[in-house]
Amino acid sequence: MITILGAGGAIANELVKLLAARNQPIRLVGRNAKSTPGATETIAADLTDKDQAISAVSGSSVVYLLVGLKYDRKIWAEMWPRIMSNTIEACKRAGAKLIFFDNVYMYGKVSGPMTEETPFNPCSKKGEIRAKIATTLINEWKSGALTGMIARSADFYGPATRNGVPNVLVFEPFSQGKKASWLVNDSVPHSLTYTPDAAQSLVQLAERATAWNQTWHVPTTPNPLAGKEFVALAAREFGVAPKYRVLRRPILRIAGWFDPLVAESYEMLYQSDSPYLFDSNKFAREFGFAGTPYAEGIRNTAASFKAKSR
């Protein structure tokens, strides 16, 4: 049994399709998990409760931790350490391997490309929390108590989801005939992971015996685009003029007074100030895939949004 903790998210939905195509038995787990085509079973569970986590993971051989929490540092601080601790304990009891799908918040502001060897140096509260839970998992596999892995992604975009900053700020507005937006600086390159690539890499990593007990950056196309280039390609796919506005820090600070999500996002704006370069060469060397070209990914994502807007 392969168990996915965190049903309904962009990566989880893609992952279910891939695993179902391999005729794998799949258990989907979430607080309010709904039946999903391809899943063998669906379980509602609160992973902050140890007993529920143990029950949800029981009988699993591989567990994917793909949980998404409300974007709130207080909720993250309270819930993430408990979720990680309970999931690790549940995997130990089940004898299951654990893959944690992570982000890059723990690296902090990096000069140059982010690699798997980049030290943790968080400059945000959310980054501190992610560093803490990632370190917890790494220490478990280093001690030999658990077989684990971290698969880390850049900011992402892709079809079949309304999640991801480019989807919200670029694809959705264009699909509605509106002007797009970009965060802070549209002139610096910003790596973006294509969600189908991320899901495919999770399957490949789990199936590669030598990939365990390591951190991997999932395949993300090199030579990232600047915001203005990304918007221009997206506009072309929608057949519209590349009209957009840049959301600068002062505007976002004011907006945060009225919108809790914007307020929570403010501490992460350092990622948009300067080049945001995500290096996945380790994966490319091992698996021979460097990521879907941006033009193709943007075309597919735009097609998905156009289909939904009809």
What are these regions (language model features)?
Residues 2-24:
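N-terminal Rossmann NAD(P)H-binding glycine-rich loop of SDR-like oxidoreductase domains
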